[in-house]
Amino acid sequence: MKRTLEFVIDCGQENMDVRTFVRRYLGFSARILTALKYEGEMLKNGEPVHSNAVLKAGDTLTLTLLETGEAYEKADLPFAVLYEDEDFLVLDKPFNMPVHPSPGHDRDSVLNAAAWYSQNTPDFVFRPLYRLDRDTTGALVLAKNKFAANAKLTKTYRAVCEGETPESGCVNVPIGLKPGHKVERCAGIGDEAVTEFQTVKTSGGYSLVDFHLKTGRTHQIRVHMAHLGHPVAGDDLYGGHLDRTEHQMLCCCAVHLLCPALDIDKTVETDFSAEQKACFPELFQ
């Protein structure tokens, strides 16, 4: 999709070059600047300019990117839209839906569903800004253009964990692929992984816990909580029991979007489904 941004330079930005304005003032990455140079357009007062061009108060700087998205097979799979504008689509990812197509899941992914959802929009681009495990529910942000893909995100996860978790804590234990396994991870080997958590409520031998991730390792919350002896309920891969639910009780319950250049500073929230909450009434009353 084509996306054009226009800015009128004020006195506080005078004598900046285009590169400095785009990087420092707008907060865009060097990759965006490169894309504007080779795949897009930079205009000052309607005339093409290089990134070293100096800006004066009253100048109009126009930035345009044109891109086409990868074609995915369309699949009519329902999902709830939590928020949408010209730059972002935030959906409520259902249980048992992978984000990307993969062997065995070539037509039931989020991207297949997004292709169906956007089929009447020419050249629609949808770029997931992070992954959620197939059985993790909650807010998933799709960027509609490269400008949006540069947004800063802050996510909050919520889980039902077995046992009585501490009031708060920080787990700083590396995570890596379990030897001999293709999917399962384990704690104690691999890359640095840091998880902060805060217990919201404890009742009936289970705890409702909020998480903020300082790193983004595969299965990070699941592995770290299993390491502490408090696996996520319903997560039988890492020791969670299925006696109360067959659904993994892990949700991305909030995401904050920040991109001043796109005029967005917004928190989008969701929660476990009513069906999931009904399995743990003592935690959700």
For each of these PLM feature ranges, what is it?
Residues 1-285:
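RNA pseudouridine synthases
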